[in-house]
Amino acid sequence: WREPCTISILGDSISSYQASFWRMLKRALRGCPVRFCDHSISGQTSGELFITMYPSIFQSHADLAHLMIGTNDCRRTVDAPHALHTGLEEFEKNVRFLLASLQSGGTRSVVSSIPPVDQQKIDAVFPEYRLEYFEPDRQAFNGVLRRAAEDFGAVFNDMEPVYAAFSPAELTIEDGVHLNGHAHGLLAARVWALFQSIRTEQTAG
């Protein structure tokens, strides 16, 4: 890329991981006038993302943004009983607020779907947290992301067809939640292609 570009990364620990998809992109773009701003924090929900990171997100004045959030929102705690950590309506409000704010600042966003998890691994590594994920919840939260992206001029990156070729165990590290290097590579390839397309439009305009 020859034109200066700032890219904001919004997410949770899947994005903040030291070997994550966007760090792969950063390495690939070394030497290009591209600046990445990392606004992803481990354990972050959609509500915490905009409350904690709101000032720094919009001080970045990013040309592009990538949002992948919801893994910590769509989980349940067995003893709650079985309560979602973030209700679906609340999640939708949070995501729509973030995307509307990014859009109003002139940032073009890519929204990636929430990846699958491996419950058996989660139970083995985090037994004391009593966490459980249900596939219908993940699909419902991904539906919110898709609709919000469409409403606010963002591009929805539906990774489901790509992930479907592999089991959750093949996509995640030993904790069952975080994507492994292979899965991050798959995600990086898709995000790169979408960023390229959007950036071509921006520089042509």
Which residues are covered by each model-predicted region?
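Catalytic nucleophile-elbow at a beta strand-turn-alpha helix junction centered on a G-D-S/GDSL motif
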Residues: 4-22, 42-45, 74
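Alpha-helical cap/lid subdomain in secreted, periplasmic
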Residues: 27-32, 48-205
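Short, solvent-exposed turn/loop segments enriched in Gly/Ser/Thr/Pro and often Arg
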Residues: 39-42, 115
